[in-house]
Amino acid sequence: MAANKDEFSVKQISPKLGGERGARNPYGPTSLHDLVEQMEFLYVDVIRAIKNSDVDPGPCDPVVEITLGNYKSSTKDLPVGPNMDWNQVFAFDKTKGDVLSVTLKDRLTNTVINKSNFKLASEIPTRAPPDARIAPQRYPLRNTKTGFYLMMSVWFGTQVDEVYPVAWFSDASEVSTCVINTRPKVYLAPRLCYVRVTIVSGHDLISTDRNRTPSVYVTATLGQVTLKTEVSSGTNPSWNKDLIFVASEPLEGTVYIRLIDRVDDQHEERIIGKLEKKLSEMTPLKVPSSAPALFYDIEVEPAGDSRRFASRLKMKLATDQAYHVAEESIQYSSDYRPFVKGLWPCLLGKLEIGILGATGLKGSDERKQGIDSYVVAKYGNKWARTRTVVNSVTPKWNEQYSWDDYEKCTVLTLGIYDNRQIFKEDQANDVPIGKVRISLNRVESDWIYACSYPILKLGSSGLKKMGELQLAVRFVYVAQGYARYSAPFRWLLPKAHYKSPLSVYQIEEMRAEAVKINCANLARTEPALRNEVVWDMLKPKTNTRYSTCDMRKVAALAFFDLFLYWPSLIVWLAIYLVVVPCIVLVGLSGLHKFLTRKFWNKRENPRSPLIVNDLKLWKLESPNLDELEEEFDSFPSSVSDVNILRMRYDRIRMVCQRPMILLGDAASQGERLYALLTFNGDDQLASFYCWLICVLVALCWYNIPMWLWSLYPIAYWLNFTPLRNDMPCGVSNFFRRLPTNEVLF
């Protein structure tokens, strides 16, 4: 089914944001919530139940119930402290009722002990930071003769309030003890570092069988990852093998090194030595360099083996702190900083984002009317998670977060997920709904982009719109002068990546390991950011449909060939009259646009959205369902139908044939150029022609003004009448006849 282009477009919205930027320190943390709509809550901070010393209430297990309109929250699922205290804040939408009812019950008998009502309009104060929190007090509940008072505080506040991240919201009152999984949180993932173990050589190695020459390979283990060298024979084997691991700060792990002797062809193996080195004992490389090669005595296996000399292993052990460990695909990278902080570039600016809400969300479970959704935003090593809005397809979050930005050529990633951790009986994995990515290169400084972004999900059944995510984005420059204007010209990656580059295979292998380490680190937080969420946020981009998309780009270049064969003289004159004045005025037009854009039109909102979804470019207007099914197929393939596999094999052969033909043609042209430069061939006339053409070109180059040379491509593109010829020119014929190596195949 053809996709509707307008359905997947980005729409500008006009939310009632919290106000203008105002005066504040751009170097400090963001405290104003001016990128979100203000949400007013009724906060109830329940501290404890206090016994009346004059009355003995007898055995009692107190429970507090708070009711506003149709919403009810209770402390029955909260642990009770030794002094009957809870210290829990409850939050209600103030528009859901006019009277707040607080009831103290006995859990054992389910009877009401005390009860009190508050009128929202007259009896509850309003408080906003930086005002201090309202002190709790003993509220005069009725029936205090039963022996209890209730210590609590009540006030009106917004999402700016410091209790917002820990409050128990009324829409999540049914999630009981799993309420912690619904709270907003900011996570700082530990920074990652490469650990390079270079196995140089072994010395005086002895096999367990003294009559046999050892065939040894070395394994190194850090955490759950084990790498090994090739097998090398002899008592003094040589490897010169780099084993690279990924470790997270504070670099407290241990590398376990084993020397394993392969006894026979049946791969019987025996450990002949071992060694342990802590990461803190390795050489920290903070500049592009190499660690010194040192000899290390190994512990001989089996234990108790006595010998007059020690076997040694020559190694280079270092923590490469000058590299940036990639955890994201390079196309979606949000950070390029190395591990060591001294090599970081200067702070460029502040990225601020307001997560307003979503509309029209669609979940994987069609039987469920609402969705328990939350948003995760990732930039650099800082992750932000909004609170979970329970059972709603149009959630409102209105939460604002900020990041320090060191490089503008980066991408902000936001994912929206269905929370499956809020009920004890439903402890499944969180389900991804979709993602939105925003390139900071498209964000102009000091503008507020308030847009509704389509949440797109590509599956085996085609492209689906899972709803829309409403965001407000702003970037503010902090750096000034030279630091700001030289930023586009500095190195994108740290210097070590250019001095001692890693291979593409190594980078991808380390990236997969970095994702696992981040999953493990963030899973240990409270509340945990689950593994499936981290993996989905860091998932690399898919490469399917690249062949068809890139061939469209090649076909676009062929469009210019149409200009060489204008259908009539009238069309040629019309194009000539339009193009030539544009070429003359292009410099003035560009300068005028730059000046008006930067200095005069600064008061206008930018027109271009941050994301442009080109369905034609990605072949998603009329997607091939079999290609999509192949893209989301497992590896190895789960398809058992031989005919489908044969069809896919033939299709990939055709796809691979196109670039091979292009590469063959390019190689042939290169061989002809090489033959021309080296004067290969038996025809001496070709050498003479080449010499003559070079002389003529040199004479023309030194005698014809440069502005005339610049007119030649324009004249060739416009295809003036004297230049029209359907037959190839003589120079092309001459070049075509030069020898190639095609005849050898």
UniProtKB/Swiss-Prot annotation:
Q: Which InterPro entries match?
A: C2_dom (IPR000008), C2_domain_sf (IPR035892), C2D_MCTP_PRT_plant (IPR047255), MCTP_C (IPR013583), QUIRKY-like (IPR047259)
Segments traversing the membrane:
568-588, 688-708
Residue numbers spanned by region Disordered: 1-30
* Keyword list, A-Z: Calcium, Cell membrane, Cytoplasm, Membrane, Metal-binding, Repeat, Transmembrane, Transmembrane helix
Q: Where in or outside the cell?
A: Cell membrane; Cytoplasm
Question: Which residue numbers delimit the C2 domain?
Answer: 21-139, 171-293, 326-453
Provide the primary localization: membrane
Question: Per UniProt, what is one Pfam family of this protein?
Answer: C2
- Name the PANTHER family for this protein: MULTIPLE C2 DOMAIN AND TRANSMEMBRANE REGION PROTEIN 12-RELATED, PHOSPHORIBOSYLANTHRANILATE TRANSFERASE ISOFORM 1
Q: What does this protein do?
A: May function as a signaling molecule by regulating the trafficking of other regulators.
Question: Can you say what this protein is called?
Answer: Multiple C2 domain and transmembrane region protein 13
Organism whose genome encodes this protein: Arabidopsis thaliana
